[in-house]
Structures are given as structure tokens and as C-alpha cells.
């Protein structure tokens, strides 16, 4: 395999999504500071407790309302087009019963200690906790759009490097342009005339964005085999660079 599955890409996007909105017919899209995939195949989301969306869901009761959660995965560097991918989750949005809120907050906080959780069901409550029962999931990026079954989504895991990816890409862009240039040497000649930027990094390879007068082009450089730790990642990048020193003290650190 030379690239993550769509389900893996969605799980990684869920883990690092820099922006998420939830939309319901007749109401302006609402920011959701918490959007957490639960093991039962639903999403826990928070919405402003004093907003129209919270009131609409409360009025609907057990029936809930049809809603779409949109998560945006932004590049961690200043690209001309910063959005790397979008994920849309459609389903029924319902309130979480008061008796279940505390337990669910603890469950979310165990893996995602989001500060917004402290503002749910508290003395200074700003957000209401809701559950989105998934009916469909679609992801889109520069290669196209694809739907994913909920079972596949639950079976997948985020990329092991997704929590560190932003810092690494920023480091490559600001301090190691020589590494980016070496990677760019693997691109077709026509693409090398554009400005090459680091776009993504995962266990399967490196993605580059080429910004040119003719538009943007995303190119993936796969590793020879997937890697699972920082040592393997560093070695795989050196192989892509064509570095002759793959081991020992003379190996370049990236």
C-alpha cells in the first residue's frame, strides 16, 4: 500500500481538523469546537447552548434534526490554497441526556482534552453536548471524493504521525528547504518549475504541493514500505532524498 485508505485519512482529519461546522436547514452553520468520533459510530459535538441550533434540537426531542458536520483539514503552512481535505458527516443530531453528559465528557477528555469540554454542563456553560448519529461519510481532496462505510471508519486508526505532522512540515518549510528541494528532484520536470511546498507527511510517504502560474498540483512520493516510528520515518525520507548514508553518524537528521 502506497497511501492511506480514505477511512484512515478521515480518522487523521478528525484528530487534527482545524475547523468544523455543523449545518441544519434554515439555520446558519454553527462552529463546533468539539467533534469527537465515538466507538459506537456516532460523533459527539458541542454547539453554543444559547444558539438557534441548540434550541431547534431541543424542540425536536428524540426525533432529532437532520444535520451535516463539515470538518476542514488545513495545511499547517501558508499555502495559496490552504485546505487539504474536507469531510462531510451526515446524520441525525440529538441532545445528550443530562444524566449521560458527565460520563460522555470524561470519555472524550481521556483521548481529547479539549478546553471547550470544561464549558459544557458547568456553572459557566457555553456549549451543549450533542450526538450526531452517522448516516453517511464522504471525504474529498485534490484527488476526488469518496464515501466510507461507518464500519470501515471505526476499524481505521489515525496516522501514527498525525499529531506531529504540523510541526514537522513547518520545520521543513522554514529550516530545511534543502530537503524539500531534494524531494522535488523526484518530480516530473514540468512540475519542478513551480514553487514546491511540503503538503503532507504520513506513514506511507510525503505529499508535495506545486504552486505554479498554471495552478496547483499535488504529488505524492511513497515510501518503499509503510513506517511506524520516527527512526523508520527519518530513514524513509533519506531514501526519497537519495541520501547515500542511510545509517550511522553520517546520516542527516530531518
Which residues does each predicted region cover?
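A general structural signal for short secondary-structure junctions and capping/turn motifs
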Residues: 11-14, 58-61, 79-80, 120-124, ...
Amino acid at each position: 500500500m502506497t497511501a492511506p485508505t480514505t477511512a484512515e485519512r478521515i480518522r487523521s482529519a478528525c484528530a487534527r481538523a482545524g475547523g468544523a461546522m455543523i449545518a441544519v436547514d434554515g439555520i446558519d452553520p454553527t462552529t463546533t469546537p468539539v467533534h469527537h468520533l465515538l466507538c459506537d459510530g456516532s460523533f459527539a459535538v458541542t454547539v453554543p447552548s444559547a444558539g438557534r441550533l441548540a434550541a431547534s434540537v431541543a424542540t425536536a426531542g428524540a426525533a432529532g434534526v437532520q444535520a451535516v458536520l463539515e470538518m476542514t483539514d488545513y495545511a499547517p503552512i501558508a499555502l495559496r490554497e490552504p485546505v487539504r481535505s474536507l469531510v462531510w458527516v451526515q446524520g441525525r443530531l440529538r441532545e445528550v441526556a443530562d444524566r449521560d453528559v458527565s460520563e460522555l465528557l470524561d470519555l472524550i477528555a481521556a483521548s481529547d482534552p479539549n478546553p471547550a469540554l470544561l464549558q459544557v454542563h458547568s456553572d459557566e456553560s457555553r456549549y451543549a453536548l450533542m450526538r450526531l448519529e452517522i448516516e453517511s461519510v464522504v471525504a474529498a481532496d485534490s484527488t476526488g471524493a469518496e464515501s466510507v462505510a461507518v464500519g470501515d471508519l471505526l476499524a481505521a486508526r489515525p496516522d501514527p504521525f498525525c499529531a506531529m505532522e504540523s510541526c514537522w512540515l513547518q520545520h521543513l518549510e522554514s529550516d530545511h528547504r534543502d530537503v524539500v528541494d531534494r524531494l522535488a528532484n523526484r518530480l516530473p520536470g514540468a512540475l519542478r518549475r513551480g514553487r514546491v511546498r511540503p503538503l503532507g507527511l504520513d506513514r506511507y510517504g510525503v505529499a508535495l504541493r506545486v504552486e505554479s502560474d498554471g495552478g496547483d498540483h499535488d504529488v505524492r512520493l511513497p515510501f518503499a514500505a509503510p513506517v511506524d516510528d520516527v527512526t523508520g520515518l527519518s530513514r524513509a525520507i533519506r531514501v526519497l532524498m537519495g541520501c547515500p548514508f542511510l545509517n550511522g553518524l553520517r546520516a542527516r537528521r530531518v
